[in-house]
């Protein structure tokens, strides 16, 4: 199972990489733009933050296949080993096929249906990213879509992985993992919600109180 952070905040990645068992970091144009740091500056810093074994994801901006391929090559040259995110449009599928032949790994992004995700996998995407909460927001069932996509990939494109994205709660992420997803990417707030429950801190404080009352110290 692979756990990613969905952010371009270098300081937060450095802080959380010490704590969480991270496989890497995912970004998108909106995330990069929010940080107001040029993509060619922030990507090397993110790669350094996650270390040489971490995987970094960044997205193309072009709308046509040839433009996507050229941008993917630039990203790959700038950060060797990067996985290039390609929106799963008609042109995006063409780009994924071309990049597969070039040996550049891709992630099919902006996936709103199981059929769309399956096409990306069959075209050669290493990862496929269904948007869970965004599907829910449009009146659909994001978790069911992920379940269907996971089953389809297991049957017809086992070399590709579902990397579920777009979460608002830890429950959504856990449901995707229960559906068999091999990878998820979490925004910072959801990642921290997985640990930050008041009941945990309350339990620790009770342990400390009992220990201190008995032994007059908080050390072993």
Curated annotation (Swiss-Prot):
InterPro entries: Aldolase_TIM, F6P_aldolase, TAL/FSA, Transaldolase_3B/F6P_aldolase, Transaldolase_AS, TSA/FSA_arc/bac
Chain segments annotated as transmembrane: none
Enzyme class: lyase
Entry keywords, A to Z: Carbohydrate metabolism, Cytoplasm, Lyase, Schiff base
Enzyme Commission number(s): 4.1.2.-
Domain of life, per lineage: Bacteria
Recorded catalytic activity of this chain's protein: beta-D-fructose 6-phosphate = dihydroxyacetone + D-glyceraldehyde 3-phosphate
GO biological process: fructose metabolic process
Primary residence: cytoplasm
S-S bonds: none
Keyword Ion transport among UniProt keywords: no
GO cellular component entries: cytoplasm
Pfam family, one: TAL_FSA
Compartments reported by the entry: Cytoplasm
Cleavable signal peptide: none
PANTHER family (alphabetical): FRUCTOSE-6-PHOSPHATE ALDOLASE 1-RELATED, TRANSALDOLASE
Recorded family membership: Belongs to the transaldolase family. Type 3A subfamily.
Functional summary from the UniProt entry: Catalyzes the reversible formation of fructose 6-phosphate from dihydroxyacetone and D-glyceraldehyde 3-phosphate via an aldolization reaction.
This protein's name: Fructose-6-phosphate aldolase
Gene source species: Klebsiella pneumoniae (strain 342)
Biological classification of the source: Bacteria, Pseudomonadati, Pseudomonadota, Gammaproteobacteria, Enterobacterales
Chain's gene name: fsa
């Amino acid at each position: 199972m692979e756990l990613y952070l969905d952010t371009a905040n270098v300081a937060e990645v450095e802080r959380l990489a010490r704590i969480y068992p991270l496989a890497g970091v995912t970004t998108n144009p909106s995330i990069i733009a929010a940080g107001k740091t040029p993509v060619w500056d922030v990507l090397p810093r993110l790669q350094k933050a996650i270390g040489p074994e971490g995987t970094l994801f960044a997205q193309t901006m072009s709308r046509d296949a040839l433009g996507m391929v050229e941008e993917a090559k630039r990203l790959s040259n700038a950060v060797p080993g990067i996985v290039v995110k390609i929106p799963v449009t008609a042109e995006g599928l063409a780009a994924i096929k071309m990049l597969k032949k070039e040996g550049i790994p891709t992630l099919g992004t902006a996936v709103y249906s199981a059929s769309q995700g399956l096409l990306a996998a069959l075209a050669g995407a290493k990862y496929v990213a269904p948007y869970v909460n965004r599907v829910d927001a449009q009146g659909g069932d994001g978790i069911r879509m992920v379940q269907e996509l996971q089953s389809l990939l297991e049957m017809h494109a086992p070399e590709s992985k579902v990397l579920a994205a777009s979460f608002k709660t830890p429950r959504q992420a856990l449901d995707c993992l229960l559906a068999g997803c091999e990878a998820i990417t979490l925004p910072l707030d959801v990642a921290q919600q997985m640990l930050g429950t008041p009941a945990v801190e309350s339990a620790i404080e009770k342990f400390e109180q009992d220990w201190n009352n008995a032994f007059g110290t908080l050390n072993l």
